[in-house]
C-alpha cells in the first residue's frame, strides 16, 4: 500500500482518499481533502498558511530534517531478494530509529519551549513597569494595614456571633392574575 503525501499540507493521502489533479503538462498533484484542493486553486502558498507542515517547518515549530527518518522514508521500487538476517537487522533498526526520532523530538520541543518561560516573565515585568500606579497600593492604605493587629476570638464569642445573625424575611408581592373568562368577555364586547 502506497501512502502519498498531500501537495498542499504534506499530510498522508491513503488509497481511495483525497483528490488527484493532473495538469496539462502531466504533473500530478494529490490533496488529502477539499480544504487543501481549494487553497491550491486559490494559489495560496503553503509556507504562509499556518496549519500546513511547510509553515511549521519554515517557522521552526517542527524539526526540519531528521537523518534517522531518512533511512525509512526512502522508496525502493526494485525488489530485494529475501534474506532472514537482513530482515532481522532492518526490524531492529526500525525500532531503534523510532526511539531515536522520539528522543530528538522531545529534545527539540524542550529547547523550543525553554525560552517561553523567560519571555513570559519579561513581558510581565514590562507590563508592571508600564502600569506602576495600578499595581502599587497607596501609602495610606499600607500604613493602616501594618498598624492593625490580628484579633484572637474565642470559640464562645464566635458561636455567639453566629446565633445573633438571623436571616431577615422580605415579603414579596405577587402580581394579581385576571381570569381567562373575564378577558374573553371583554374582547368579545370590543368586536361588536
From Swiss-Prot:
InterPro entries: L24e/L24_sf, Ribosomal_eL24, Ribosomal_eL24-rel_N, Ribosomal_eL24_CS, TRASH_dom. GO terms for molecular function: structural constituent of ribosome. One of its GO terms (biological process) is assembly of large subunit precursor of preribosome. One of its GO terms (cellular component) is nucleolus. SUPFAM superfamilies: Glucocorticoid receptor-like (DNA-binding domain). Its main location: cytoplasm. This is Ribosome biogenesis protein rlp24. It comes from Schizosaccharomyces pombe (strain 972 / ATCC 24843) (Fission yeast).
Amino acid at each position: 500500500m502506497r501512502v502519498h503525501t498531500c501537495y498542499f499540507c504534506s499530510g498522508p493521502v491513503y488509497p481511495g482518499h483525497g483528490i488527484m489533479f493532473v495538469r496539462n503538462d502531466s504533473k500530478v498533484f494529490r490533496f488529502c481533502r477539499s480544504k487543501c484542493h481549494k487553497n491550491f486553486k486559490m494559489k495560496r502558498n503553503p509556507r504562509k498558511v499556518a496549519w500546513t507542515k511547510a509553515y511549521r517547518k519554515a517557522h521552526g515549530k517542527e524539526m526540519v530534517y531528521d537523518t534517522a527518518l531518512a533511512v525509512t522514508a526512502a522508496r525502493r521500487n526494485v525488489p530485494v531478494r529475501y534474506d532472514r538476517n537482513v530482515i532481522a537487522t532492518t526490524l531492529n533498526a526500525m525500532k531503534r530509529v523510532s526511539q531515536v526520532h522520539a528522543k530528538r523530538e522531545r529534545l527539540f520541543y524542550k529547547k523550543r519551549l525553554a525560552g517561553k518561560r523567560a519571555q513570559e516573565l519579561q513581558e510581565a515585568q514590562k507590563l508592571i513597569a508600564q502600569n506602576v500606579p495600578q499595581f502599587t497600593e497607596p501609602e495610606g492604605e499600607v500604613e493602616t494595614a501594618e498598624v492593625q493587629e490580628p484579633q484572637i476570638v474565642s470559640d464562645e464569642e464566635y458561636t455567639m456571633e453566629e446565633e445573633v445573625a438571623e436571616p431577615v424575611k422580605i415579603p414579596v408581592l405577587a402580581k394579581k392574575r385576571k381570569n381567562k373568562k373575564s378577558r374573553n368577555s371583554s374582547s368579545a364586547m370590543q368586536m361588536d
